[in-house]
């Protein structure tokens, strides 16, 4: 929910201000354009990101969020910000259901922190869920398995092996998608030096065990209602094969640390204590078992007596209370002691001692979440992790027994510990210490923490860090051995250093040779401390960015791949929501009506689907580009496409910047920031050549629409729209994998340049996802060169798709209505909605050049502004058209820009409906086939490359586009012209 109490109402209940004191570093206020209904639906993260953007150097006016805003990478999607062209920055942060084809032997991590070989998943007796990364929420999650399939390997098909810097290895088919900081990239397209996102936890192998832990006979002495409650939740009988065993072991471990089982008002209850976030995670586990629990937060006085003195004060106490007597009794049967634990003898339950290793892992992870210390570092070295428990003096022996039981469990994971007593005036206190880097690494990689978010994220980050440190030390040790061998053979320090120069410096080699070797290898001086590593590499939820150190194609030594279908996938705005993708939308009008098209609508969709290549690098190729031709696309965009016969010269007058960013930047005198053809790596060229002229998947689409309602008849007529029922065509796609690759090649440069920005402007960037470069620097110019080259690719892509769509209409309706010209198929407008552009705007009464970032936002210029920037005026006497796609089941809009938008939002408005539900959530909730059937019932036909994509784009997954448009209209930053409704949808 939004922090509504912080928002200041400006006007019309659709314009709101986020004050500068929301975050101390804000240089300007935030400005939110949304109805109260839309405000209520915005994640708090949107407002935090608005505030973070307001902290960037050189920002003017406001950090803006439009009504379709939702949480993004760095900037909110639906965000706008303008920066001084001399004293500001450019930031890439401003501008899904996957089937994975994996090699046998691949380890798949489950919800319980254990792994299963992919080929063994169908054989498992349990229905454990798999662990996934919910990108929307920045946290791990779990998902049910939809299916596990196997397929034979095709003749001459190769596999790809990818190795990261910490040693993580994955092998799969070339089209297996891998998550990178910029989104999903196919395994076959990853290169050495690329970055990928990993989950740094090894876990232990899943092991099945037969038999029963508890059954009805264990509850013969209790009220039958207790047994009924447990049976209704499938908690009795409790068998080893039930995945709930892992959850119960976790809960029991935490309860033995921070839980209390006792009577309250004569009723047995179970309570847990701790940090609110920790208890909310625990509450999720309880609810997954069907057990209700309530959080209670209160202030309380405390008194603590330690060896060093007595302390008292006030603290906030948080309790998670389970009212169910039945569940409390179940926990008691599982070994939870009744009464004050400090005064009650207990031990590690026998069933835990007898359990498979993965169950023991969950018990320990819950226990250490409660009573274990968080991992800490002294620069490069981890400090001991301690488990602390106390008893009254009479129970010292019982305490030692319990701690020794825990030590024995840890030893089964290869983790050695030390037990020692801590001085205490009141009770006997013992600490079980995990000491030594190897032991700590094993604990973090195999056991770790559950529930406590801080401990868990720190633990995951620490494990990744220690694995990286281990690999670096190993490389340096091998370099020392190699250097010594080369020196012995050649007698040359120079040759010895040349042999290992990519790993160590010359001084290291000299020490190896002259000092008789190196007794113990340490990390180099420039190796990051743990704190710096976290800052640079760790994402929300403990996921970590790692560099790929090896990629190789291999001949499979097996005869089949395995495919996993899950009901959860990562939200793809990490890829699509950044500048580099330059997504955009185009609308064309026709002189046909719905009555003309409806009888042959299905045939039309089939024809478009056949003529317009879809998907990820569709095999159906209409164009085969040479490298030189692709370089021409990078420089000239849609103009290149028209010269090659894809469309007409008149089309260019209805495209933002005539579809040619070279011309646009030459016109305004900033040609050094325009596109260049030398910014593309070999890999970008390889990706771009086959994908030009393809629609793409995800939220990319081609729709056949009809005019549903006309609001401004004069403006509509100037656009060629005369009546309701008239057919239009909307194309939504972008720069495909080429844009991703070109700009991701430059992203690491931007990340490095951020330190220069902080030094230059004396600021601290509040979010590392706001990587940026100071305008005027080579890094900023190169980024613009790359981004504008990708923009040209996108303009050319939409131009080619439009041409083939015209041909499809002629193929289906030509005999009856003539050629494309006879049918009046003309471009109304084509505009990008993920771009940063250099534009001139008034600031404090003075015209200034600004860098305007529009992420998931659309330019909405007045006619005067178009002329000032040398932009084509598509319709004389009208502001620039604005195209707002909705969802498949409702509609889209054509708006026009306003003077109010020029004054307040740098000539910007919303770009679409905006999501309310992640793709993962949509696929959990909807079946693509059901969505398609329901749309057909409404008169909307869908032709898609896959049904999961249809599920992702289900209408309920989006905000109400009518509400979004109402917000910008009432705010005065756009005026509605027509509403369009879909009748046919083509998706890649």
UniProtKB/Swiss-Prot annotation:
InterPro entries: Hint_dom_C, Hint_dom_N, Hint_dom_sf, Homing_endonucl, INTEIN, Intein_C, Intein_endonuc_central, Intein_N. The active site is at 911 (gmp-histidine intermediate). Pfam families: Intein_splicing, LAGLIDADG_3, RtcB. Keywords: Autocatalytic cleavage, DNA-binding, Endonuclease, GTP-binding, Hydrolase, Intron homing, Ligase, Manganese, Metal-binding, Nuclease, Nucleotide-binding, Protein splicing, tRNA processing. CDD domains: Hint (cd00081). This protein undergoes a protein self splicing that involves a post-translational excision of the intervening region (intein) followed by peptide ligation. GO terms for molecular function: DNA binding; endonuclease activity; GTP binding; metal ion binding; RNA ligase (ATP) activity; RNA ligase (GTP) activity; RNA ligase activity. It comes from the Archaea. Its cofactor is Mn(2+). One of its GO terms (biological process) is intein-mediated protein splicing. The keyword Repressor does not apply. Its EC number is 6.5.1.8, 3.1.-.-. PROSITE patterns: INTEIN_C_TER, INTEIN_ENDONUCLEASE, INTEIN_N_TER, UPF0027. GMP binds at residues 699-703, 833-834, 885-888, 892, 911-914, 987. Ligation proceeds through 3 nucleotidyl transfer steps, with 2',3'-cyclic phosphate termini being hydrolyzed to 3'-P termini in a step that precedes 3'-P activation with GMP. In the first nucleotidyl transfer step, RtcB reacts with GTP to form a covalent RtcB-histidine-GMP intermediate with release of PPi; in the second step, the GMP moiety is transferred to the RNA 3'-P; in the third step, the 5'-OH from the opposite RNA strand attacks the activated 3'-P to form a 3',5'-phosphodiester bond and release GMP. Essential for tRNA splicing and maturation. Acts by directly joining spliced tRNA halves to mature-sized tRNAs. Joins RNA with 2',3'-cyclic-phosphate or 3'-phosphate ends to RNA with 5'-hydroxy ends. NCBIfam families: intein_Cterm, intein_Nterm, RctB_rel_intein. Belongs to the RtcB family. This is tRNA-splicing ligase RtcB. The gene is rtcB.
